[in-house]
Amino acid sequence: MTRMKKHLRRIALILAVLFALGVLAAAGTNAVVMLSAKRYFLSNEGAAQDANFDAIVVFGCGVTAQGAPTYMLRDRLETAAKLYFEGAAPKILVSGDHGRSDYDEVNVMKRYLIEKGVSSQDVFMDHAGFSSYETVVRAKEVFLCERPLLVTQRYHLYRCVFAARAAGLEAFGVCAEGPV
């Protein structure tokens, strides 16, 4: 084998090992997040029975060009409204992107909740919820939540609960999964 081929083979092996290590690191990090957050997941019934939360926090996830919540966002809002009416928390904090004048998740979210019968006075809007982390930090620092109930889909809830707990909140989460 020529010297060049040996050299290329060695480089390929090093790259393969580095790639495998990267995959293992990502999988390990994901496992830590999931295992540490899952114990703070509640069922809808469990959240309503606890009923000791400052607010229900709903994470934005898009609105249509017509100004309606996306299917996933509707699931989150429906779950939040149900929890609110069951007495899980006295307030709902909707958090999402309103960084441009032509895109406004939070007002769409608030309007949807009001149409479902939630009192306008009980819905607070975080117009700067550009990421899950920013949402939980702002829930604590701006909206003074100490014990929020986070509502989003399961795949996203692990990260949200983990971030909230890391930020010092006594956060719990409820999965928004399909029609409530």
Indicate residue ranges for each PLM-predicted region.
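Short, intrinsically disordered low-complexity segments
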Residues: T2, L8-R9, D75, E146
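N-terminal type II signal-anchor transmembrane helix
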Residues: R3-G46
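A structural signal for short, hydrophobic/glycine-enriched beta-strand patches
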Residues: A31-V180
